């Protein structure tokens, strides 16, 4: 049986192959200024991911509006089984692999699976890994994460390899929304090298310079959220840095 990859994932893979990296903007549906944020980022992001760690209100309405405003692929990033709507294009179908609670490893995605099928949403199979200092953030608390220490990059690498063996095509290395510092470069590089699948990096990425480093280290996708909420104009410079790094990375790889 041939594995079917949907339209959204195919488009994202195309961007990564041709431009070296993609830029996702995370919009919390509970954010009061989501319309303003959506209007600004529509010319810079490659996709919008929609989700939050704690209770979501009016997800259908917000997702539909964001999709209409941006015209970009809208991908759900569900914090729980209630974080799914038929108004989106796709969903990050994920396992929080290093949670201490099996609910977040397997039960939550299993409970949401039938709804996803009913809505006809495209799924992007993904391992979600909580990296230090995620325990100090909302997702770390809610998800009961046994965070991976930054000084042990090989642990993230092994988890990423395991994810690839499970058939997942994406790994999200997450330091947490508003994290004090981002996932380190060595961890990103090892995770990419061992798994060979798409690596998403988010949390604590506040400057274009840091985003550039992460892409050059092996990240295929950079996610910003809190930064976008505080300074929507920052996304323009962030995109420039990510795309420059992507092309520089492709040139570097072509010489090997």
From Swiss-Prot:
Reactions this protein catalyses: sn-glycerol 1-phosphate + (2E,6E,10E)-geranylgeranyl diphosphate = sn-3-O-(geranylgeranyl)glycerol 1-phosphate + diphosphate
Cellular localization per UniProt: Cytoplasm
GO molecular function: imidazoleglycerol-phosphate synthase activity; magnesium ion binding; phosphoglycerol geranylgeranyltransferase activity
Keywords: Cytoplasm, Lipid biosynthesis, Lipid metabolism, Magnesium, Metal-binding, Phospholipid biosynthesis, Phospholipid metabolism, Transferase
GO CC, alphabetical: cytoplasm
InterPro entries, per database record: GGGP/HepGP_synthase_sf, GGGP_HepGP_synthase, GGGP_synth, IGPS_HisA/HisF
Pathway(s) of this molecule: Membrane lipid metabolism; glycerophospholipid metabolism
Top EC class of this enzyme: transferase
This protein's name: Geranylgeranylglyceryl phosphate synthase
Record organism: Methanococcus maripaludis (strain C6 / ATCC BAA-1332)
């Amino acid at each position: 049986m041939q594995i079917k990859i949907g339209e959204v994932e195919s488009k994202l893979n195309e961007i990564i192959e041709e431009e070296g990296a993609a830029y996702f903007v995370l919009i919390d549906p509970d954010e009061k200024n989501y319309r303003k944020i959506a209007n600004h980022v529509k010319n810079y992001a490659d996709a919008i991911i929609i989700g939050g760690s704690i209770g979501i209100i009016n997800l259908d309405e917000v997702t539909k509006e964001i999709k209409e405003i941006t015209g970009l692929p809208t991908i759900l990033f569900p914090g729980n089984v209630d974080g799914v709507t038929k108004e989106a294009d796709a969903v990050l179908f994920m396992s929080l692999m290093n949670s201490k609670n099996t609910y977040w490893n397997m039960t939550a995605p299993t409970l949401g699976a039938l709804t996803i099928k009913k809505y006809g949403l495209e799924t992007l199979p993904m391992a979600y890994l909580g990296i230090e200092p995620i325990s100090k953030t909302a997702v770390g608390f809610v998800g009961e994460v046994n965070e991976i220490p930054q000084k042990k990059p090989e642990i993230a690498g092994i988890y990423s390899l395991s994810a690839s063996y499970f058939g997942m095509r994406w790994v999200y290395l997450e330091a947490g929304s508003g994290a004090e510092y981002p996932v380190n470069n060595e961890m990103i590089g090892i995770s990419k090298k061992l798994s060979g699948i798409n690596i998403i990096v988010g949390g604590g990425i506040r400057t274009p310079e840091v985003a550039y480093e992460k892409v050059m280290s092996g990240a295929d996708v950079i996610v910003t959220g809190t930064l976008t909420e505080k300074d929507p104009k920052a996304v323009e410079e962030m995109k420039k840095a990510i795309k420059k790094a992507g092309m520089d990375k492709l040139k570097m790889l072509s010489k090997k």
